[in-house]
């Protein structure tokens, strides 16, 4: 047996006997470290003759590779043994439920927009959209709102500044979605049935008002449309939206520049234990404004008022969401509070439809 065979047997035995990774590291350093026995013998090759160097060098390389492979194998074996020992001391109850993954929710405003879109689509209304930054003409003039009207003052409307020297009327952040109706009539003519949901802007801020809120307005133009048609549409909408078998509406004479005659609409309701009940009781709650489209508005949109007539209505989406789902403060709609959204939000896959139920 040569000296290298003796060295090999010594370290193979030491590797096999190493009880943990620390002991195995000591063996590695003793054999292959900078001052290890095999490393020192590799340095002695320079003092040998060429023939001895070739023979001994090859043998040392084989020994080094074998020891290194044995060290790696033993290290993996120790790691596997440690894992087995740890697993034997641990246990997992596979019957435990999994951790729920936090899912997002649909905002009440988005939900209500989808609900009212489904209801009016069932009555033949299409959805129309328009810009949120409007010209003075579309937002006011075309809707028969005179220059002296309070809504055209700076304390009520957000005006967009023009460049210095530009004397044209300023653009505004639209104060209602009625300009969309003008654009729809200009583009499609008559007859037409559209609703226009979207964001609107007014200078107001309290528990029931915010500078930005959501509104939906409806428009129907045909040759024989009357207030009776308006009443039926609004009753059907309220019955479907509030998910009650019947509703009673009260029309109160009012004044809006863009409709004539005009009416504010109240719905019969009651309050029981702080909860609003629609369709019963002795109370009345205002929910929207409506009326027959003013002939000047039809003419401004390019529709002949001698041939066509129609009705229009408008309501606050945030307001009817508050009424239906018992939300006390309008400002919370825009605060991005995750706790609030999880409480009042809706499951992403619960898309409202009349057959399956608007809210589930």
Curated annotation (Swiss-Prot):
Compartments (UniProt record): Cytoplasm
Top enzyme category: ligase
Keyword Disulfide bond tagged: no
Cofactor or coenzyme needed: Mg(2+)
Classification via InterPro entries: aa-tRNA-synth_II, aa-tRNA-synth_II/BPL/LPL, Phe-tRNA-synth_IIc_asu, Phe-tRNA_ligase_II_N, Phe_tRNA_ligase_alpha1_bac, Phenylalanyl-tRNA_Synthase, tRNA-bd_arm
SUPFAM superfamilies: Class II aaRS and biotin synthetases, tRNA-binding arm
UniProt-listed PROSITE patterns: AA_TRNA_LIGASE_II (PS50862)
Listed Pfam families: Phe_tRNA-synt_N, tRNA-synt_2d
EC number(s) per entry: 6.1.1.20
Keywords per UniProt: Aminoacyl-tRNA synthetase, ATP-binding, Cytoplasm, Ligase, Magnesium, Metal-binding, Nucleotide-binding, Protein biosynthesis
CDD domains: PheRS_alpha_core
Binding residue positions for Mg(2+): 260
Cofactor detail note: Binds 2 magnesium ions per tetramer.
GO biological process: phenylalanyl-tRNA aminoacylation
UniProt-recorded Gene Ontology molecular function terms: ATP binding; magnesium ion binding; phenylalanine-tRNA ligase activity; tRNA binding
Catalytic activity: tRNA(Phe) + L-phenylalanine + ATP = L-phenylalanyl-tRNA(Phe) + AMP + diphosphate + H(+)
A GO CC term attached to the entry: cytoplasm
PANTHER family according to UniProt: PHENYLALANINE--TRNA LIGASE, MITOCHONDRIAL, PHENYLALANYL-TRNA SYNTHETASE
Family the UniProt entry places it in: Belongs to the class-II aminoacyl-tRNA synthetase family. Phe-tRNA synthetase alpha subunit type 1 subfamily.
Alphabetical list of HAMAP family matching this protein: Phe_tRNA_synth_alpha1
UniProt subunit comment: Tetramer of two alpha and two beta subunits.
Name the UniProt record assigns to this protein: Phenylalanine--tRNA ligase alpha subunit
Organism, as annotated: Cereibacter sphaeroides (strain ATCC 17023 / DSM 158 / JCM 6121 / CCUG 31486 / LMG 2827 / NBRC 12203 / NCIMB 8253 / ATH 2.4.1.)
Organismal lineage: Bacteria, Pseudomonadati, Pseudomonadota, Alphaproteobacteria, Rhodobacterales
